[in-house]
Design a protein with these regions (language model features):
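Hydrophobic ligand-binding cavity/cleft-lining segments
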Residues: 1-69
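Generic marker of residues within folded, mature protein domains
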Residues: 6, 45-47, 78, 108-110, ...
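Hydrophobic pocket/interface hotspot
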Residues: 16-20, 133, 167
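Short, solvent-exposed secondary-structure boundary motifs
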Residues: 28-37, 76-81, 106-112
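Beta-strand/loop substructures that line and gate deep hydrophobic ligand-binding cavities in soluble
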Residues: 53-58, 84-153
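Helix-adjacent hinge/juxtasegments
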Residues: 63-91
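A conserved amphipathic terminal alpha-helix motif
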Residues: 84, 146-174
Length: 174
């Protein structure tokens, strides 16, 4: 099983990418998701359209906030603060502003890793950006890993889609 989410927002790919690589947006999103943004970095610090870009995001969430969505055998692992490590490797922009990224999201507590591709490209009429996210989750916990991955995949897809919706709201304010 894998996840695939597609969202369209009324901003250019350049604006969407600029938001996704902005620390203030990630603070805003972390607050909305009841998480803490522990670390955020973008290399190069002020990317141009010709640059490939690396993004590193470290968040923590309260495990009890989502433990009830996990299988009972795994709920005991979701205690206290749970670290979420996210890295993104973005391509340089195409002439129309489109960009692609390979993203990895790790949750060490669950021995789980999600890999995804993120695509930003202009809508056909140029009125916005289509954000496509597609990927899968693997967990290496013996006997339970496949069940964890199966339950996590839709949640990761929803999280990434929710992040895009938060970006739309944030861009409206900035």
């Amino acid at each position: 099983m894998a996840f695939k989410e597609t969202t369209t927002i009324p901003y250019t790919p350049k604006q969407v990418f600029s938001g996704l690589t902005n620390r203030d947006f990630h603070v805003y999103a972390a607050d909305a998701f009841r998480a803490d943004l522990d670390e955020f970095s973008v290399m190069p610090h002020e990317p141009t359209s010709d640059d490939t870009v690396s993004v590193n995001i470290q968040r923590t969430v309260n495990g009890e906030d989502f433990a009830n969505k996990l299988p009972s055998a795994v709920q005991r692992f979701a205690k206290g603060r749970v670290a979420i490590e996210q890295t993104e490797a973005w391509s340089a922009a195409a002439d129309d502003g489109a960009r692609d990224a390979n993203a990895t999201i790790k949750v060490p507590m669950a021995k789980a890793t999600a890999t995804a591709t993120i695509k930003l490209y202009p809508t056909e009429d140029g009125s916005g950006t289509v954000v496509e996210t597609e990927g899968s989750v693997k967990s290496t916990i013996p006997l339970m890993g496949s069940k964890i991955a199966q339950l996590a995949e839709p949640q990761v897809g929803k999280f990434l889609n929710g992040l895009t919706k938060k970006l739309e709201a944030w861009l409206k304010e900035h």
